Structure formats: structure tokens, C-alpha cells
Amino acid sequence: MQPAKEVTKASDGSLLGDLGHTPLSKKEGIKWQRPRLSRQALMRCCLVKWILSSTAPQGSDSSDSELELSTVRHQPEGLDQLQAQTKFTKKELQSLYRGFKNECPTGLVDEDTFKLIYAQFFPQGDATTYAHFLFNAFDADGNGAIHFEDFVVGLSILLRGTVHEKLKWAFNLYDINKDGYITKEEMLAIMKSIYDMMGRHTYPILREDAPAEHVERFFEKMDRNQDGVVTIEEFLEACQKDENIMSSMQLFENVI
């Protein structure tokens, strides 16, 4: 399997990348596009590209329809329930499930496999720590594995969720110990992991203290009562009032 070509990303790669107006990485000839509500939109997610790589051949022929029919005969259990829980159609869920089972015959993705996936798409840096945090965000029940249900529910939020849903998902990602608060230590760990993942191929090259500065700007904006932690209420209110943050939400999809 060949890693997908690198796309333009924010230099810190985060949902809140515009807090300090961090410049974007530049690569000539490649433009970011807003995901469309189609199968191609699903494939913009690097994890989905990996999962669907064996089920989305270039061009079309009679074998495509045969594959779709075989998918219908082997629907995942609870397909109707998943359709109700997500914003994917039955056909999209079937396609996602087929790819998931092709790459993960056990029906599970463990953390080591998830890290290997992410390493392919960020070869210029070290994605290990960020992949660990992201894995925990997808692993909704905390059992150490991502089930198909975990995957599609999270993906539905990230690609087709409301602003409120996406922000709540991001808060859960940043709240590393899941106690309902984001501390400076947690945010610094997230920022360092994102900067490590992006590597040295950012423009301009980032200073060593850039992650800490980003965290300080984050707390100046989010921590209304200055108690040293950010609650979900503070996070949602501050984000939805900030035009830069709202316009940068698409950048989060590029990292995922």
C-alpha cells in the first residue's frame, strides 16, 4: 500500500490552529478542498484511504457492481442502527465495512496498527504520540481496540457532524484523562505531539517554544475564570465566538 500524497495542512495541524495565526505549510500545485457529501469525501480521511484502498479501484467495470452485491449479502450486524447513529447511507456503510474487514479481518484495529497507519501519512515527522491520543478518542469504550462501530460514529462526526458535535469531539481529544477538563499539561502534550508529527517540513520553521506559546494563547482565550483549566462550556462558548477558530475547523479534518 502506498501512502497518500501529502496535502496542505496547518503547521500545527490542530483544530485551533488559528489561535496564533500560525502560517500554513506550502506545497505548490496542491490545494485543500472542502469534503463533499460523496464516497470521495470519505476517502479524504487518511484512515479511510487506508481502509478503502482495496475497494476503490480506479475506473469502473462490471466487477464493481458485483462487489457491491457481495457487500449486501454480508452486511455488518446492526447496519440500520448504524445508519440511524451516523450520517452515512447504507451503501457508504457497506463500503466502509468491506474495506475495514479486508484490512482488519478480526474486525478490530489495535493501537499498534493505528500508529503504523498514521506513520505512513506523516513520514516527515513522528506521529506516534498524536496517533495514541487520536486512537483513544476513537476508542469510545476504552477497551484498547477500535471496532467498526467506533470508527464510523467518530468519522461521521468529523466529516458530517454539526459544529457543536465536532467541537465536543475535539474537546474529548484534548481532554487526555477524560475528567471533563483540559489542563495546560494536557494541551501542551497535544501540541507537542502535533508539532512532532508535522516534523521540520513547516514553513516557516517553528521555534522550540512554539507549542508552549500556543498553549498560553489557548488558555488566554478559553479559560474565562482563570482557574487553570478549560471546561467543555468554556471551550464551546469561546470557539463558537471566534471566527478564526470556526474557519479553521476544516484543517482538523486534514489531520484526521
From Swiss-Prot:
Effect of residue 64 to A: Abolishes cleavage by caspase-3
One protein family per Pfam: EF-hand_8
Quaternary state and interactors: Binds to DNA as a homomultimer. Dimerization is induced by binding to calcium. Interacts with the C-terminus of PSEN1 and PSEN2 and with PSEN2 CTF subunit. Associates with KCN1. Component of heteromultimeric potassium channels. Identified in potassium channel complexes containing KCND1, KCND2, KCND3, KCNIP1, KCNIP2, KCNIP3, KCNIP4, DPP6 and DPP10. Interacts with KCND2 and KCND3.
Residues the entry annotates as binding Ca(2+) 2: 223, 225, 227, 234
UniProt keyword annotations, A-Z: Apoptosis, Calcium, Cell membrane, Cytoplasm, Endoplasmic reticulum, Golgi apparatus, Ion channel, Ion transport, Isopeptide bond, Lipoprotein, Membrane, Metal-binding, Nucleus, Palmitate, Phosphoprotein, Potassium, Potassium channel, Potassium transport, Repeat, Repressor, Transcription, Transcription regulation, Transport, Ubl conjugation, Voltage-gated channel
PTM description: Palmitoylated. Palmitoylation enhances association with the plasma membrane. Proteolytically cleaved by caspase-3.
Keyword Transcription regulation found: yes
Effect of residue 179 to Y: In a breast cancer sample; somatic mutation
Lipidation (S-palmitoyl cysteine): 45-46
Residue ranges of coiled coil: none
Phenotypic consequence of residue 61 to A: Abolishes cleavage by caspase-3
Region (Disordered), start-end ranges: 1-20
Tissue expression profile of the protein: Highly expressed in brain. Widely expressed at lower levels. Expression levels are elevated in brain cortex regions affected by Alzheimer disease.
Modified residues (Phosphoserine): 14, 60, 63
Ranges for domain EF-hand: 67-123, 126-161, 162-197, 210-245
Job of this protein: Calcium-dependent transcriptional repressor that binds to the DRE element of genes including PDYN and FOS. Affinity for DNA is reduced upon binding to calcium and enhanced by binding to magnesium. Seems to be involved in nociception.
Species for this entry: Homo sapiens (Human)
Protein family (similarity comment): Belongs to the recoverin family.
GO cellular component annotations of the record: cytosol; endoplasmic reticulum; Golgi apparatus; nucleus; plasma membrane; voltage-gated potassium channel complex
Impact upon substituting residue 170 to S: In a breast cancer sample; somatic mutation
Name of this chain's protein: Calsenilin
